[in-house]
């Protein structure tokens, strides 16, 4: 079944807020691209624990967040965010939103064609969709270092991809096929300092990868530390794909 990484993804919302706070902190450029207006109704695809959702609300919009992690939805609701536990590809909204937004989510959605069509349906005619995701080349050094460490320890890294790190052309093809026009997608090189260290990043952001490689919980901190030694820096080689598009009026 070609779906989001899992029908519901498991994240530790507290760990994510601690180790991954940079995700929302660096989401300002995508939010500015969305340019939410007072009175608009906006769909936040992959709202996480709701940090950026609240920033949209602060600009006067009404927002519905969706996410496929029960832990993240609980955290978002605790902040007062209107949020639903729902994979992006399963949304059944029809012309309800003036705009849609997504930050650091779409690269997790392997059912990309279905998700693109669902977002398109959710927008009113003339509605816009803006955001950011991991792009082509994202985290190549870190991902390679992790797989090398797994192999040395006798584990088999998963063969199937857990992320869609698209080129601008690949991304545009999917969303134009969904019906969008004026698709503007571009890669942004964004080396990112990981304040809590690469080891914590590995155990938080590559949890699903470690699950699939069947690495025991008791060994994961050790794996993370070894990957940090391999990389030799707390700067992660992030590449973002930033985009904006419109549904025809």
Region roles according to the model:
Residues 113-128:
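A short glycine-rich, Lys/Arg-flanked "PGG" loop and its adjoining helix->strand segment in the class I
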Residues 89-100:
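A short acidic, Gly/Pro-enriched loop at the edge of an enzyme's catalytic core
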Residues 1-40, 51-55, 72-75, 130-153:
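Conserved class I S-adenosyl-L-methionine
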Residues 178, 183-234:
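C-terminal helical/coil "lid" or tail adjacent to the Rossmann-like core of SAM-dependent
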Residues 43-45, 49-91:
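Class I SAM-dependent methyltransferase SAM/SAH-binding core
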Residues 164-178:
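Short alpha-helix
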Residues 99-112:
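A short SAM/SAH-binding and catalytic strip from SAM-dependent methyltransferases
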């Amino acid at each position: 079944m070609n779906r989001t990484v899992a029908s519901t993804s498991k994240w530790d919302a507290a760990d994510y807020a601690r180790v991954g706070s940079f995700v929302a902190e660096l989401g300002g450029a995508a939010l500015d691209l969305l340019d939410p207006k007072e009175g608009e109704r906006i769909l936040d695809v992959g709202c996480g624990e709701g940090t950026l959702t609240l920033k949209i609300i602060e600009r006067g919009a009404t927002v519905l967040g969706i996410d496929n992690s029960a832990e993240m939805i609980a955290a978002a609701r605790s902040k007062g965010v209107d949020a639903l536990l729902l994979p992006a590809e399963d949304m059944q909204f029809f012309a309800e939103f003036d705009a849609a937004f997504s930050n650091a989510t779409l690269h997790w959605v392997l059912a990309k064609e279905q998700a693109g069509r669902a977002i398109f349906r959710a927008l009113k005619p003339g509605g816009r969709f803006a955001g950011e995701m991991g792009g082509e080349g994202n985290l190549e050094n870190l991902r390679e270092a992790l797989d090398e460490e797994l192999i040395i320890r006798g584990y088999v890294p998963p063969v199937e991809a857990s992320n869609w790190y698209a080129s601008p052309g690949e991304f545009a093809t999917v969303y134009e096929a969904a019906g969008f026009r004026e698709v503007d997608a571009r890669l942004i090189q964004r080396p990112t300092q990981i304040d809590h260290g690469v080891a914590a990043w590995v155990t938080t952001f590559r949890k699903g990868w470690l699950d699939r490689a069947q690495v025991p919980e008791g060994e994961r901190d050790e794996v993370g530390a070894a990957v940090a030694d391999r990389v030799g820096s707390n700067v992660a080689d992030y590449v973002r794909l930033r985009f904006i598009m419109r549904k025809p009026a």
